[in-house]
Amino acid sequence: MGGGDLNMKKSWHPVLLVNQERVWKAEKVANEEKKMLAQLRKEREEERQLEELHRLQEASTGKKRVEKLDWMYAAPSTEGGALGGARIGERDMEEYLLGKKRVDEVLGQGDKNIGAASREFIALQNANTARDTAAKIREDPLLAIKKQEQAALAALMNRPDIRKQLRAAKKAKETKGREGESKEERKARKRAEKEERRKSKHRYHDSRSPPSDYYDDRDHRRHRDSYDSQDRENRRTYRDRSDRSRTRSESPKREKKEKDYSNRDRDYRRRNDTTRGSFDESPRKGGGNRWGSHGPDGYRRSDHRDDGFRERQRGDRIPPPRHLSYNHSTPDVRPSSPPSSSAAPVNRNTSTLEDQRAARLAAMSASADELYSSRSKSLAARAEEERREQEKDEKMRQKYGKEQASANFFSQQSQLGLGEALQRRGGKGLLKDI
């Protein structure tokens, strides 16, 4: 009978599971210890690096870093120690030991010394000198970009084609802004520009030549032209207003009033033209040929009778073209000052011309006042009629409109009885009374 391997029955044999478990546990403890040692070595290395960084920071800033527990041992001593290397004398040390001097005073003095040293260190660096500031400005990238943009813009503005395009764009913008204006605004703008040009030209002539009868007559003609243009503008405005009111409401009474007003306006223009023609004919009746005070050669004579001719010429040019024209063969009037032959005829003709102007102005003022009064009366009557029509429309709307229906509905609801109201809640009789 075979006995097998007897060594397998020994307690020290490595094949036994008990021995293998003991070896595994020992190896496990050894591995854990190695790991702990490696971790401790790593932590110490990190602490050493951190202390090195703190030391470099203290050297650069000059401020000593206080450890977490150093404040417990901070006390004055003759060797410095926790005071950052600051030493005190034996007398101060004796006073501290006897309780005559506090520790915080010595520590505060040390902190002041450290702060002063750091400020001196920063002042010695010269970080904000004029040269450094100029260098920073010179090396600024945003400033360099801005300078490049300004140089490019200046180069573009020096080119004639670019400047021509800019002027064209500006002109197009102004034209576009004028496109939105109405016809009346455009006429008013052109009239203002024309008046400004005339004033500048008048100032130029006044500064270069003395006043004369020609300029006085021209001023009177300008005054009458402005009055006529204002009258035409008023008639145009009234005509537009009449058209708008006619589109709003076509009433027979309103049409009749507008027709009467247009007839009165036509009569006023006819009377004004007749008055103007009579005043314009007065110099002709006084004497002179059809050339006025000018001869066939076109030169002015010395009797000052060309004023009447100019008045007739202007009276034929200003009104509508239904009047006769007297200047079809008259040469151009030259505003040259005439050589006076005698003083008495000049004064007489001047006084006659002034009387004519005064009479004409009085007639024009009377006609304008009459037209204004008639127009005011017509506008007041029209406003009163419109107010009456509006009141009538309001009454009709209140009588047959939604307000009356809603009022009738609530009044009927308040007059209903309890039984009828309950029936209506159930859906009966909803269309009987409404």
UniProtKB/Swiss-Prot annotation:
Pfam families: Cir_N, CWC25. Residues 359-381 have a biased composition (Low complexity). SMART domains: Cir_N. Its main location: nucleus. Residues 43-63, 156-412 are annotated as: Disordered. One of its GO terms (biological process) is mRNA splicing, via spliceosome. One of its GO terms (cellular component) is Prp19 complex. Associated with the spliceosome. Belongs to the CWC25 family. This is Pre-mRNA-splicing factor CWC25.
